[in-house]
Amino acid sequence: MLKSRHKMREAIFKSLFQWDFNKEEILEEISKEHIVSLEPNLQELAVNYLKGIRENIDVIDEIISKYLKNWTLERLSVTDRNILRLGTYELIYVDDIPIEVTLDEMIELGKTYGTENSGKFVNGVLDKIAKAEAPKEKFEL
């Protein structure tokens, strides 16, 4: 299941990455090509994640911006920006995923798709967000 969830996060990231270039496209439509190979229950979960991210994008971006030091969201690479969006969504809005799992998964996405510094950068920003913004119950998972 863990490897399957990793594939799901990867599909969500790829959908967000593509959507970032053309916000006129419907995110859920873009995602179809990326989530088709997932198990049916994970396809549904991926769609829920994407819907949640789209509906809360302004709040998510505001939270990320608050914890960027010497950067703006717009100056980040498309890769780092969308990994941070996915990670922030999971930290704030998904109750049953432990913080450490989210951080580890986002670091891996950063290492796979970003620059040599993406993993460390993503970890630093998401760690600050987790400590300050994540629901307290998540620290007990």
UniProtKB/Swiss-Prot annotation:
UniProt-listed CDD domains: Terminator_NusB
Pfam families, per database record: NusB
Keyword RNA-binding belongs to the record: yes
Keywords: RNA-binding, Transcription, Transcription antitermination, Transcription regulation
One Gene Ontology cellular component: cytosol
Alphabetical list of InterPro entries matching this protein: NusB-like_sf, NusB_fam, NusB_RsmB_TIM44
Gene Ontology BP, a term: transcription antitermination
GO MF annotations in UniProt: RNA binding
Entries under SUPFAM superfamilies matching the protein: NusB-like (SSF48013)
HAMAP family given in the database record: NusB (MF_00073)
NCBIfam families assigned to the protein according to its UniProt record, in alphabetical order: nusB
Role noted for this protein: Involved in transcription antitermination. Required for transcription of ribosomal RNA (rRNA) genes. Binds specifically to the boxA antiterminator sequence of the ribosomal RNA (rrn) operons.
Family assignment from sequence similarity: Belongs to the NusB family.
Entry protein name: Transcription antitermination protein NusB
Species: Thermosipho melanesiensis (strain DSM 12029 / CIP 104789 / BI429)
Gene: nusB
